[in-house]
Design a protein with these regions (language model features):
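Enriched for short, Lys/Arg-rich terminal
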Residues: 70-110
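Basic/aromatic recognition patch in beta-strand/loop cores that engages polyanionic ligands
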Residues: 39-82, 87
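N-terminal targeting/export leaders
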Residues: 5-8, 25-33, 39-45
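Arg/Lys-rich, positively charged N-terminal/basic patches that mediate binding to nucleic acids
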Residues: 1-24
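Sequence/structural signature of beta-propeller domains
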Residues: 1, 22, 26-27, 34, ...
């Protein structure tokens, strides 16, 4: 299975602020290559998924959440958001609405 991974600038910024590295990004990409549908679909977002991503030494339950969309037809995964579970559990309705608009925009561009 192949995918192109696209990191939005806001994602990259948050990724670095969380102390995650390029090696962590490679681990994330490998997880998604083995199963792009690993994340649970977030209702009302146009197909966006949320997955747990373990930070070494913390385990999955206390680590980060990665928000992404997999455009299967185009074989592209866009990384949209990342945050620690301790910072917030779920996306707000406003965030979901904004991400849905982003997905619609990305679909038009592909």
């Amino acid at each position: 299975m192949t995918r192109e991974f696209i990191y939005l600038p806001t994602f990259e910024s948050k990724w670095k602020k969380l102390g995650l590295t390029d090696d962590d990004a490679i681990r994330l990409e490998n997880e998604l290559l083995s199963n792009p549908l690993i994340g649970k679909i977030i209702e009302g977002t146009g197909g966006i998924r949320k997955m747990r991503f373990a930070i070494k030494g913390k385990g999955k339950s206390g680590s980060t959440r990665v928000i992404y969309i997999d455009f299967q037809v185009h074989k592209e995964i866009f990384f949209l958001d990342v945050y620690q579970k301790s910072d917030k559990e779920d996306l707000s309705q406003h965030e979901k609405s904004q991400l849905k608009k982003l997905v619609e925009f990305l679909e038009e561009q592909l």
